[in-house]
Amino acid sequence: MVKTYLRLDLFFSFLLSIANCSSTNDTIKIDTPVNTEPSKKLVIPIINEASGIADSKTLPGHLWVQEDSGNPAQLILLNHNGKVVKKIPIKGVKNRDWEDMALVGNQLYLADIGDNAKVAKEYFIYHFKEPTSSTDTVGNVSVIRYKYPDGSHDAEAFLIDPKTKNILLITKTDTLSRVFKLTYPFAPSMNEAKLVGTLSYPYVVSAALSPNGKEAIVKTYGALYHYKQKSNESLETYLLKGPFKSLPYHIEPQGESVTFSATNSGYFTLSEKGLAAAVNLYFYGRE
């Protein structure tokens, strides 16, 4: 999260996004085209600091939303029309700097991986069974603890390979975003992330995997990058080797969240409020 809302970050990231997309070596056609004009729903009441979203399986037509540092340890249930339905407290955990979210199988993962000042000694990924309509409080939470081999890093995106269960962590503020891996099975105490590669751009703020695990979206402030599995590649392989293509994206005030729809019919984005007067939920449907 960027509490000071430095608009230069967004501007330079946008320029980098355009430059990266201009390389023909880094593009691939998407099998199913995506609408360039998204649907837009005003979020009511406003969610100020959305940092991760996931499209619900237990409650079709709804998204789970988390906010980052300085906000309660809770889930926000948001319907596809932009209405906040309820808030669900999560017991036994702290929101130090929650920065991304993923729904894998029936487990909802919350990534406490942000570290703007790069001073943290360890980081946390919480997971628990996806809530249902009758859930008022989440209490049975598991945690994956990890550290980096070379000190502290600020990360705002992660992906979980549904086949290997390995977790890929993507840093934000390195010159080029670096990719670290947590290898499954995870130790109950401390895990060490291993550097496995770099992306060709910086300022990654969110990432999402399609329901079938064959597509990934990596988000910066100014762009959405689409990766597609070839043959039977692992997520790590097709993310690091590419190629990739820029997806349609309406620039948001401080957009830090992306997720595929649970039916794989498109993707959602949701921004922090930043300096804007309102927040909108965007959906880009496949044609």
What spans do the regions from the language model cover?
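Bacterial Sec-dependent N-terminal signal peptides
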Residues: 1-34
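Sequence/structural signature of beta-propeller domains
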Residues: 22-287
